[in-house]
Amino acid sequence: MAKFEIIDTNTWIRKSQFDFFSTFLNPDYGFNKKIDVTTVLEYSKETKTSFFINFLYVFSLAMNDIPEMRLRYVNGEVRRYDLINPGYTVKTNDGSFNNCGHEFTRNYQEFYSRAHEQIEIHKEKVLTRENYNDNDRFLTMMVPICEGDSAILKPVFKTDIPISEFIKKFIPVKE
């Protein structure tokens, strides 16, 4: 069971923003941007490990280190989860795709092992479940062919995050 803290929205420093955005039909956020992944790519080649899993680890660390990214609005209450888990899409062996994810851990070896195991399981066949959007999950899509802005992938937040800065947990937001 995921652990979380309930935020008292009446005394919350972000009450005015919460009141404003909670009136939106879909008050979610997202961002997309080219990221310099040279360091992760070099590490993956040197260690003969999966670039996808390695980048997912770095990204998951950043998502968990930013308290605002762990906020969720569930059943009329704002929750800050202790940890959030990555959700991602994998290509199946038959050419289809499958949604999968695993429990987050800061331990790299354990994270890598969990991700690798889930990817292998979900590559074999499409598994269905009742809910793919657990409250303690963040969904990620890493598409290497998307470049710049597009009408389809228009972000709410635009970020320029070189991987070296991303590891340091900076998220500059512009226009």
Language-model features, listed with the residues they occupy:
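Catalytic micro-motifs at enzyme active sites that drive phosphoryl/nucleotidyl and oxygen chemistry
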Residues: F18-F20, N75-V78, A151
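Acyl-group handling in specialized metabolite and lipid biosynthesis
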Residues: F31, V40-T47, G95-E110, V156-F157
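A short, aromatic/hydrophobic, helix- or strand-capping loop or linear motif
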Residues: E68-N75, E124-E130
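Small-residue-rich loop/turn and linker elements
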Residues: M69-G101
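Helical lid/core segments from catalytic subdomains that handle acyl or acyl-like groups
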Residues: T92-D149
